Amino acid sequence: MKIIFYGTREYDHYYFDVLAADPEYGCEIRFLTANLDADTAPLAQGGDAVCAFVNADCSAPVLEKLAQVGIRCLLLRCAGYNNVDLAAAQKCGITVLRVPGYSPEAVAEHAMALAQAANRRICKAYIKVRNNNFALDGLLGYNLYGSSAGIVGTGRIGAAMARICHGFGMTVLAYDQYRNPALDGIVRYVELDELLRTADLISLHCPLTVETRHIINVDTIKMMRDNAILVNTSRGGLIDTDALIDALRARKFAGVGLDVYEDEDGQVFEDFSDDVLQNEVVPILMSFPNVVVTSHQAFFTRTALQSIAITTMENARAFARGEKLVNEVKG
């Protein structure tokens, strides 16, 4: 089975090359630095499958071009699949497989790191000390111990975040359509309105769907406690950015930590340090002293990358052998 990898970085080579050389997987890999889109889809000619990341264009026109060059399988080396037109994939005869849970702890740990960095002004403190300024002005934060955390979405990542918050000595509230029995004794499930009104730290861990888009908006922000901490390591579209910026200007939040944000496509994972940034969202958000923005890196640990590689190759092997596809995504 020949797999064409799109949007690859050096670390992809490091973790996938070893597995590709293993006869157990029986795969040949061709790495492309170009990301998957309508222009690059024809480069998959001669392959059986393509492998793409969360920032790839997997819309209907792209999938149609992949099908035209003989691609039968789309391997997502990520958990999210809201960038994939599943109906078009089915119509084109392309099987979609994903990595449902590579290291939930990695993302949850980053979420707590963002919460603390924003709350305790770690970035500002670092810059001050670098400039030999050891004054404490502007660095006042809040205790997490004894406060309440609100976890929106209690899948694997949300559950990991709940356990972290519990370990910090926080009262943990949770909202999800489905209760996670593994969290019995750790969280108390409540309605979203109660969570927003009660929690001192709100962390988003739900998928981006029609129902969850802008789950954080003008109205839900008004429900939140003043000086709450808001963290998003899930999908940028969960937060209405304009509403968030207005709330920050009104000094609503003690801190905001974002690993994702709206309209990050075309910018995420790229280096624009020598360019003029065209996206206005990040500069505005970074102008607030209590906001910390990172580059969609919550997943980015050695443990997670190894797990992603193994599961992706196992998905490819199962497809090639006609075995049960436990990680298939259907429309």
Per-segment meaning from a language model:
Residues N227, G236-G331:
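Rossmann-like dinucleotide-binding domain for NAD(H)/NADP(H)
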Residues D137-D226:
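Rossmann-like dinucleotide/phosphate-binding beta-alpha-beta segment
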Residues V54-N55, D200, C206-L208, S234-R235, ...:
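Short glycine-/small-residue-rich Rossmann-like dinucleotide-binding loops
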Residues P42-L43, E194-L195, T220, I284-L285:
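Structural alpha-helical scaffold elements that stabilize or flank donor/cofactor-binding regions
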Residues V231:
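Glycine-rich nucleotide-phosphate-binding loops and adjacent flexible coil segments
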Residues C92-S148, A160-R163, G167, Y175:
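Phosphate-binding beta-alpha-beta segment of Rossmann-like dinucleotide-binding domains, i.e.
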Residues M1-L97, N217:
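An N-terminal-biased, well-structured beta-alpha scaffold segment characteristic
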